Amino acid sequence: MDLVQKQKSLQDYTKSLFLEGILDSQFLQLQQLQDESNPDFVSQVVTLFFQDSDRILNDLSLSLDQQVVDFKKVDPHVHQLKGSSSSIGAQRVKNACVVFRSFCEQQNVEACHRCLQQVKQEYYLVKNRLETLFKLEQQIVASGGMIPAVELGF
């Protein structure tokens, strides 16, 4: 695949992430903060999000598996995950966290377990898709190209 095809492929792939609701405009704002002085800014921020999210999801699993669930511990974790996913534009993770928090407020253990599975599913989806996006970007840079701006236009 030549450079122009790689760039077009990246643009199409990125658009699909927005069309599927996986990412929202916050991700574009994050990309705008990246420049020549810090070319890995977005991938660094997203990597930190992945590390924090893995820890939070593990903590949530442990908390919900307790004999007596302490929702005063569960809710702050969900709130933190909602905030961090919102800050990188991981829209579907954020939306799943909103539902999760409502069940925390109701102290509905069964529904919280289902929500945790949904959050994990959305998280692993966005993680996989962003890792693919970054690989495409790396291939373009390795070929001597520039990362093209994405015009969503929808």
Curated annotation (Swiss-Prot):
What keywords were assigned to this record? Acetylation, Cytokinin signaling pathway, Cytoplasm, Nucleus, Phosphoprotein, Stress response, Two-component regulatory system
GO cellular component terms attached to this protein's record: cytoplasm; cytosol; nucleus
Q: Report the PROSITE patterns cross-referenced here.
A: HPT
Q: In which tissues is it expressed?
A: Strongly expressed in roots.
Induction comment: By salt, cold and drought stress.
Residues recorded with modification N-acetylmethionine: 1
Intracellular or extracellular location(s): Cytoplasm, Cytosol; Nucleus
Instruction: Give the protein name, as stated in the record.
Output: Histidine-containing phosphotransfer protein 1
* Organism the protein comes from: Arabidopsis thaliana
